[in-house]
Curated annotation (Swiss-Prot):
GO biological process assignments: translation
Alphabetized Pfam families for the sequence: Ribosomal_L27 (PF01016)
Disulfide bond sites: none
Origin superkingdom: Bacteria
Family: Belongs to the bacterial ribosomal protein bL27 family.
Protein name: Large ribosomal subunit protein bL27
Molecular function (Gene Ontology), one example: structural constituent of ribosome
PROSITE patterns cross-referenced by the UniProt entry: RIBOSOMAL_L27
UniProt-listed InterPro entries: Ribosomal_bL27 (IPR001684), Ribosomal_bL27_CS (IPR018261)
Species classification: Bacteria, Pseudomonadati, Pseudomonadota, Alphaproteobacteria, Hyphomonadales
Keyword Transmembrane: no
Ranges for region Disordered: 1-21
Amino acid sequence: MAHKKSGGSSRNGRDSNPKYLGVKKYGGEVVVPGMIIVRQRGTVKWPGKGVGMGKDHTLFALKGGKVEYAHKSGGRIYVNIVQMADAAE
């Protein structure tokens, strides 16, 4: 018969890799087509004019210009791209 208790296995020791979510371009920043504006899980922010949404809900620029965040009724936040000539007015 064994006189030494067997060592228990740890139930910790796991950790997931970081996903680097969040806003990548803030309001007023200049973007070119294809730039990622927001990486998110679900539709925290919605695409507006000049912004597309990927299958993982990533928002990206479809055209160049300045980023603008608009708060609409219902609590939705829309991300728009304003062209540079319009932004100067």
